[in-house]
């Protein structure tokens, strides 16, 4: 398969997932989003955003899903806010949520590899959250795009599941099921929804087990200098939550901030 074939397959999966979320999870958001104090941030995000400052900054979120996190960023004082996602239906959900919340954000349906060039060099912050990087077939090209989106001295903030978790099946505990160095994508023929595990997602999708060095190396290769990195014992994915209770456990998530130096 070619990279675009993977992207289109994953797009179909996300559109199916959006339909599932519209039946339950999104209805819960519809009321919450109207609250001026609505935020999705946990303590890690609060601390990092407080340190870097959001006031008036131009922010773009890649793989933004339905935009709820971007809406939070806007409500926290950011300036121009743009969200990119491959799913038509999640972008439509996001526009509806933003309208209900009275929030001015721009949500664009696009693969991250096909972002309009007129967005390059326009942002102070690229924001990437849980469940984004594993759906991308070419991480090096992705970080090249991240760099082009940023102004000089702009920052990228990544808050993601730790890639070591790709070695484990969440239902089998800490039994190693895959090599950390696997390059072939995992094929998900029938997955379950992360908000409602009773719902089966039938579309075939592809998850790429990138190494942590792929993330850090991608930043460094494209002129993004690390200013912060930390690993955590809490799960962001809702898949490995049971691992939090293990006495001996691997890292479950991490945060990374890097600055464009040229």
Regions found by a protein language model. Give the residues of each.
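N-terminal, positively charged/glycine-rich alpha-helical extensions of SAM-dependent methyltransferases
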Residues: 1-29
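Conserved alpha-helix/loop element of class I SAM-dependent methyltransferases that forms part
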Residues: 27-57
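Class I SAM-dependent methyltransferase SAM/SAH-binding core
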Residues: 58-115
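A short acidic, Gly/Pro-enriched loop at the edge of an enzyme's catalytic core
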Residues: 117-125
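A short SAM/SAH-binding and catalytic strip from SAM-dependent methyltransferases
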Residues: 124-140
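A short glycine-rich, Lys/Arg-flanked "PGG" loop and its adjoining helix->strand segment in the class I
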Residues: 140-155
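Conserved class I S-adenosyl-L-methionine
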Residues: 155-193
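Short alpha-helix
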Residues: 195, 206-230
């Amino acid at each position: 398969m070619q990279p675009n074939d993977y992207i289109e397959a994953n797009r179909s999966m996300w559109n199916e997932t959006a339909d599932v979320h519209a039946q339950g999870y999104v209805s819960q958001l519809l009321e919450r989003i109207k609250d001026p104090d609505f935020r999705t941030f946990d303590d890690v995000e609060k601390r990092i955003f407080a340190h870097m400052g959001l006031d008036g900054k131009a922010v773009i979120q890649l793989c933004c899903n339905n935009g709820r996190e971007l809406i939070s960023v806007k409500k926290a004082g950011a300036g121009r806010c743009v969200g990119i996602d491959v799913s038509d239906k999640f972008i439509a959900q996001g526009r509806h949520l933003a309208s209900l919340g009275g929030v001015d954000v721009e949500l664009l349906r696009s693969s991250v590899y096909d972002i309009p060039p007129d967005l390059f060099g326009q942002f102070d912050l690229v924001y990437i959250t849980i469940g984004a990087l594993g759906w991308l077939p070419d991480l090096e090209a992705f970080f090249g795009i991240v760099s082009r989106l940023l102004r000089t001295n702009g920052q990228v903030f990544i808050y993601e599941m730790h890639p070591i978790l790709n070695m484990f099946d969440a239902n089998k505990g800490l039994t190693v099921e895959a090599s950390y160095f696997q390059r072939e994508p995992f094929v998900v023929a029938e997955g379950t929804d992360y908000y409602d595990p009773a719902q089966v997602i039938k579309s075939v999708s592809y998850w790429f087990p990138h190494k942590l060095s792929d993330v850090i190396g991608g930043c460094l290769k494209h002129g993004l200098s690390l200013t912060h990195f930390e690993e955590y014992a809490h799960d962001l994915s809702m898949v490995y939550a049971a691992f939090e209770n293990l006495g001996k456990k691997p890292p479950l998530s991490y945060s990374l901030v890097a600055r464009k130096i040229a």
